[in-house]
Amino acid sequence: MNRHHFFSTPAIFFISTLFGLPGCDLPSPTPDMFYKFDVMSVGKGPSYLLTTDLNLDGEPDLVTVNTKDSSLSLLYGKGDGTFHTARNITVAAEPTMVTSGDINRDGIPDLVVNARGAEMIIVLPGNGDGSFRKPIPTRTGKVPLNVILADFNNDGKLDAAVTLTFDEMEIFTGSGDGYFHKRQTYSTGSRSFSGVAEDFNGDKKMDIALAASSSSASSIRVFLGNGNSTFQKPKSYAKQLVPLAVILKDMNADEKPDLVFATGKGDNLFMLYSKGDGSFSKPISFSGGGGPFALTVGNFNPDKLKDVAVANSRSSSFSLVTRNANGTFHYPTRDYVVEGGTVLAITSGDYNHSGMSDIAVASNFKNIVEIYLQRRSFK
């Protein structure tokens, strides 16, 4: 065989037809929509990022979970894309994630931290000025991985679902004063580092979807709630895809909560469209980056369709995946190399009052957070 003429004429014609471009041109990547605006130092080993308003000033703030020095870094937003120098606070051993909610019903956001090494979740009651009162710990089972807040028994108080390393999920009911009380334990069939809560079947009872990632029994597992802090037997979707992270967003504007998830099996992302009855479509695959690990959804271009940004742990980058007019995802992705490498966390918000979604990523290796602002005109 002539090695200099590997592709035959029919093969070249097929590839050219596939891409719909003369001369077999490859498709262009997503436009360059972001530019690096700021870099900030945080604690050691940032592994999770949260956008929230800690001090109720209307400006989005950032919280990083720093696993290596068991701390949180609080970055208060100025509203122009910059943030004040991080304030670091020590929490219990090996925190892995943080979420926010009004746990004690005083109208002020509180933080709830999952502390893997201490085997507990910790409530940090907010004062409304960005500071916090004495932590309130709640003991969990062995090696907690993730905490999900929602009102699971319809009493107007936030409850917590905590996933454990050894394939279990514990349900804690909230008493409305910052304290939680254990109620039920469920088998998940697989460890879960990520999950979300929403009413998937329209019965006004909160349900749970978990990214169950153990390779032998991996799937997206959906637990439909009974409205009294108990749940039905889970249903599994996207089996054997090893989902690592799952987020919730209405991706097709039908007012039903859809699921987008990253997997440990290849570099693709997947989406499950909600049918509104508690069930979901077959997984729809689209391209991610090198080692997709964490996700955020926002309007990352002017077309009003929900787009996806993914943190890539293997390629030290994050990738932007925008939508086409027909709802499909653009290929190839636009990739942004992160200075500090080892990107484990990503979040988004309007950090400069531009009316457009911006992106923050955390480098686990160099202990920094990078801010990327959206361009008004794209390259």
Predicted regions and their residues:
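Beta-propeller blade termini
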Residues: 47-56, 76, 96-105, 125, ...
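Hydrophobic beta-strand segments that make up the repeating blades of beta-propeller
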Residues: 62-66, 111-114, 160-163, 208-212, ...
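Bacterial N-terminal signal peptides
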Residues: 10-20
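Glycine-aliphatic tripeptides that mark coil-to-beta-strand junctions in extracellular
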Residues: 58-60, 107-109, 156-158, 204-206, ...
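Short glycine/acidic-enriched loop and turn motifs that connect beta-strands
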Residues: 68-70, 117-119, 166-168, 213-217, ...
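Blade-edge motifs of beta-propeller repeat domains
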Residues: 24-44, 76-93, 125-142, 173-190, ...
